[in-house]
């Protein structure tokens, strides 16, 4: 395959000497070697393959990571050094579009006309440029707004094992927050199902977040590196999405929402790459650079004087083990953690948020107000007492409890059920209309519960309702 003469004149040309899955060795014999992280390009059957330099291994050979499939690549194929890192288009011209890891459109809407490009590898903003303001981001989801309030301009993690509702919860937050949001939104799909990305795109078109008739009026950009793609794409696509979010932030046009689903797949891709590069694995088979990989991504997700990035990230927990090194590496970087529990999901309580394991840095009376703080801590206290009594109940039964303990158990069970909520994105499955509950209604409802105002209502009146008024109406039909 002959490359265009103009590329040969301005770029170094090498030759492929080895291809092992997504790792490609390229020889630049007698020439200066490309820098680490430089992008190399090779054209096979009119398809461009993008490589990223990750190692210099001696004998004028660089080891590279492929961003797309290496099918058809052969020894001796010519490769050009672009002389720069992978760059992706940024700015308003990519609104309403779906991009891959190298910024190419994958939505069949034609090429992107863009003059502004930005490299995907960057340093975090300097300390003096970072913003530390703290205010609550209202999601309309009772259990989150009450017990683990999200920080506007902060980093939020949704932790959970397989099938407990991470993606549904992140989709509901997109529905409640992004649709009513004036700023821009970036959704980054990292190693997840292609079908989910397609469903999200259609939903955004249907709700006019993406305006196909006038793309510049759209409010979102989608970036996908799905589970069928090489580990290079899955390891770098989170950086591509973050680069686009940073560009919107630095345009000084308000806050930016950055959704990432799923951070664990980013870690998993890093482990695959580490093995292919011959590194010795660390605990549980993860790459030895796990903390560095996570840190280099998370430290860039920050708010500055120009604008704020609010990041909401789904994080898969292998085998429901929160002590696994991958989720542990994420905990330290987050401002709020929402833990989804399989035991709670088994009780039919959705969203299956564990109110005692989840936390937020702004669950503080000085930030959220004394009333909100008092109600939240009292709810946690009642739920903790109920949890400690469950062994007694299992062995001796409820009748052996004191009257005060029986009252706490009754209120705790009602609180548990009132923490449930029908979701807009799950209407087709539940047959129930979704509910958005304001923070004021949430605090008012739980305050009444802990004060005993609704002790006479049956438990099921509180299940899958929005506000407390809806629970009162439901009790009349039971």
Swiss-Prot record:
Record-linked InterPro entries: AAA+_ATPase (IPR003593), ATP-synt_VA_C (IPR055190), ATP_synth_F1_bsu (IPR005722), ATPase_a/bsu_AS (IPR020003), ATPase_alpha/beta_chains (IPR050053), ATPase_F1/V1/A1_a/bsu_N (IPR004100), ATPase_F1/V1/A1_a/bsu_N_sf (IPR036121), ATPase_F1/V1/A1_a/bsu_nucl-bd (IPR000194)
Cellular compartment(s): Cell inner membrane
Coiled-coil spans in chain: none
Binding, ATP: 160-167
Topology of this chain in the membrane: Peripheral membrane protein
UniProt entry tagged with the keyword ATP-binding: yes
Recorded GO MF terms: ATP binding; ATP hydrolysis activity; proton-transporting ATP synthase activity, rotational mechanism
Protein keywords: ATP synthesis, ATP-binding, Cell inner membrane, Cell membrane, CF(1), Hydrogen ion transport, Ion transport, Membrane, Nucleotide-binding, Translocase, Transport
Pfam families: ATP-synt_ab (PF00006), ATP-synt_ab_N (PF02874), ATP-synt_VA_C (PF22919)
A GO CC term attached to the entry: proton-transporting ATP synthase complex
Listed EC numbers: 7.1.2.2
Family: Belongs to the ATPase alpha/beta chains family.
Function: Produces ATP from ADP in the presence of a proton gradient across the membrane. The catalytic sites are hosted primarily by the beta subunits.
Subunit note: F-type ATPases have 2 components, CF(1) - the catalytic core - and CF(0) - the membrane proton channel. CF(1) has five subunits: alpha(3), beta(3), gamma(1), delta(1), epsilon(1). CF(0) has three main subunits: a(1), b(2) and c(9-12). The alpha and beta chains form an alternating ring which encloses part of the gamma chain. CF(1) is attached to CF(0) by a central stalk formed by the gamma and epsilon chains, while a peripheral stalk is formed by the delta and b chains.
Record-linked HAMAP family: ATP_synth_beta_bact
Protein name per the record: ATP synthase subunit beta
Source organism (scientific name): Orientia tsutsugamushi (strain Ikeda)
